């Protein structure tokens, strides 16, 4: 779920963030508007994709300094990763993922979904922690901190209500519907103490995930701080939405590290947050950043076999802007992961080759994230 550069610019204007789109270590928002620069970038990517052999790709990747490889991040040593959020309930499904040689997997805590409360999440994590060759693997829990999800166990059916076009939901920190079309997801006023209490403290969701053995959390909808309804609610509450998001992230990291001192926090998307609050404020609270759709995306809600869930090329200006934003995190010593949705040749190879050449850690899958990818990194 990422915002286009145009949408982001409007959101930043609403937030009155003078650094948005520019800032330390990267190009300004104006610099990416050059069609010539975008065309040059696209041409270079296409040429590299069409002429590189597997050996050349591997040699090139080995020669590039990997972002955050020498950092103190618990994820510094991760090179390959898998992202699967659905169909991980049966032994066969868990075994299919466990058999893959990924250094890190990002998965759901199954027992946080209604009617799955008895699922043995800790047992799944224990199984996934060790690769087939006996080496360790990082297991990270996906959580949506910027949206309430009506299928979660925290959503009380006879008390919580979804928002309408004119009114917030119940509780009133539930503000609006997901703008990208994801059903059952509702942006929230994440600074509200009632929302934060679900996640923080000794009995909060983050501490529970740490006790179940997860090595960290993968934070979705950090970008919520730019949503128009969220911005309006923040203004009414006298809250700086960007600062409030970083403060919330810091609290989440502290809650995890109270259980596991190496508990990792990965921010998904919102690579412009570094401009809104400054690198010195943001980066000490993160252990990595991950970005969707840098090169290719897909339709929200598309099933695994649906062609609309892959191969939708991102505008070249947006791609260039995203790369520049991610490079700021890289310059700050943070591991950078990318996840793109592509299936048709040469798109997966283009992503892997280009992402690696930038020092990033790429994955190419399908937008449903319901199976291990059929375009794994070791094939490219």
Task: Give the role of each language-model region.
Residues 266-301, 345-363:
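Substrate-binding cleft/loops of secretory-pathway carbohydrate-active enzymes
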Residues 320-380:
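Substrate-binding cleft of secreted/luminal carbohydrate-active enzymes
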Residues 149-204:
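Active-site-adjacent "subsite" loops/lids of carbohydrate-active enzymes
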Residues 21-24:
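Bacterial signal peptide processing site
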Residues 66, 70-170:
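N-terminal carbohydrate-binding/catalytic regions of secreted carbohydrate-active enzymes
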Residues 142, 242-276, 334-341:
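Aromatic-lined carbohydrate-recognition surfaces of secreted/lumenal glycan-active proteins
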Residues 82-99, 195-210, 272-278, 347-351:
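Short, acidic/polar
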Residues 16-19:
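C-terminal motif of bacterial Sec signal peptides marking the signal peptidase cleavage site
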């Amino acid at each position: 779920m990422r915002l286009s550069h145009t949408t982001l610019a409007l959101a930043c204007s609403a937030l009155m963030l003078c650094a948005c789109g520019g800032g330390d270590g990267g190009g300004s928002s104006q610099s990416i508007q050059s069609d010539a620069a975008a065309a040059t970038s696209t041409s270079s990517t296409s040429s590299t994709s069409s002429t590189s052999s597997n050996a050349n790709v591997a040699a090139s990747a080995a020669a590039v300094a990997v972002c955050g490889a020498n950092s103190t991040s618990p994820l510094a040593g991760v090179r390959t990763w898998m992202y699967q959020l659905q169909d991980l309930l049966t032994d066969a499904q868990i075994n299919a993922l466990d058999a893959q040689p990924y250094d890190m997997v990002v998965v759901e805590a199954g027992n946080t979904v209604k009617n799955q409360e008895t699922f043995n999440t800790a047992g799944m994590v224990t199984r996934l922690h060790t690769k087939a060759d006996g080496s360790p693997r990082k297991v990270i829990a996906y959580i949506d901190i910027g949206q309430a999800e009506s299928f979660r166990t925290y959503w009380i059916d006879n008390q919580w209500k979804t928002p309408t076009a004119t009114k917030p939901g119940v509780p009133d920190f539930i503000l609006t519907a997901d703008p990208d079309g994801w059903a059952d997801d509702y942006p929230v006023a994440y600074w509200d103490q009632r929302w934060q209490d679900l996640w923080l403290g000794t009995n909060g969701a983050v501490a529970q995930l740490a006790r179940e053995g997860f090595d960290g959390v993968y934070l979705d909808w950090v970008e919520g701080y730019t949503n128009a309804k969220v911005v309006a609610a923040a203004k009414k509450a006298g809250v700086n939405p960007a600062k409030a998001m970083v403060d919330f992230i810091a609290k989440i990291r502290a809650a995890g590290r109270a259980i596991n001192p190496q508990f990792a926090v990965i921010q998904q998307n919102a690579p412009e947050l570094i401009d809104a609050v400054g690198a010195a404020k943001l980066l000490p609270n993160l252990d990595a950043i991950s970005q969707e759709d840098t090169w290719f995306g897909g339709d929200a809600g598309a099933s695994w076999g649906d062609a609309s869930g892959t191969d939708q090329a991102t505008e070249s200006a947006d791609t260039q802007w995203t790369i520049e934003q991610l490079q700021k995190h890289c310059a700050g010593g943070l591991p950078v992961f990318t996840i793109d949705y592509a299936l048709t040749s040469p798109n997966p190879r283009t992503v892997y080759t280009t992402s690696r050449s930038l020092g990033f850690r790429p994955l190419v899958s399908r937008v449903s994230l319901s199976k291990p990818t059929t375009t794994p990194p070791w094939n490219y």
